[in-house]
Amino acid sequence: MATYLIGDVHGCYDELIALLHKVEFTPGKDTLWLTGDLVARGPGSLDVLRYVKSLGDSVRLVLGNHDLHLLAVFAGISRNKPKDRLTPLLEAPDADELLNWLRRQPLLQIDEEKKLVMAHAGITPQWDLQTAKECARDVEAVLSSDSYPFFLDAMYGDMPNNWSPELRGLGRLRFITNAFTRMRFCFPNGQLDMYSKESPEEAPAPLKPWFAIPGPVAEEYSIAFGHWASLEGKGTPEGIYALDTGCCWGGSLTCLRWEDKQYFVQPSNRHKDLGEAAAS
């Protein structure tokens, strides 16, 4: 029984299947963790969703910003952009089934035995684990309800960018969504910066990567995340695992076998352009 953590798939179905064959992943025996952004940019978003859904209890995933954007397109709120290559999925006969399944997936995964936490963008240093759990449940409850289009219409935006337990309503939900799915840099007090997308070395002072600011979750748990392809899996502290290595941009799809911390890599079938990845 092994646990495999894989970074952002972004519709790269062929690379996903090749990587799973490489590690000899066995559904029903092994467990697959996915950091979110299953869809968009790669050519196989439909096949990725069908396959991941078919895994049932053998998969644990979190939603990413591109997954949420897909749901907004599906709900008629956002425009379907050709570069996202989502049309085959949106026009598929099982689109309703797949996307209603997708919107019921979580923002946060926790394994207490492994002391492992996973979220698409990471965990803001302003939260302890109990707060992160409660915040994830708040958004998950709205997404799985009949009123989810109303939330998706209001989720776009960069403010508020500072956590307070007093946040209420759509502002609270927007902050939670941004923290779980869009965060990269923070100010020293943990306040989110939603504008900078440079590499950590090029970010203006006083910004730091979220994982460089001490927080209560990282003191007790390992954290796995995706979202930040331009990191190329490098530069994180011990116990923080950056798994998005830009497969859809011509990088690679990366897998971490949790039990022995061994990495496996499947090169992308596309030309490398991590500069575009930094802007996504």
Curated annotation (Swiss-Prot):
It comes from the Bacteria. This is Bis(5'-nucleosyl)-tetraphosphatase, symmetrical. HAMAP family: ApaH (MF_00199). SUPFAM superfamilies: Metallo-dependent phosphatases. It catalyses: P(1),P(4)-bis(5'-adenosyl) tetraphosphate + H2O = 2 ADP + 2 H(+). Belongs to the Ap4A hydrolase family. Hydrolyzes diadenosine 5',5'''-P1,P4-tetraphosphate to yield ADP. Its EC number is 3.6.1.41. One of its GO terms (molecular function) is bis(5'-nucleosyl)-tetraphosphatase (symmetrical) activity. It is an enzyme of class 3 (hydrolase). Coiled coil: none annotated. Keywords: Hydrolase. Pfam families: Metallophos.
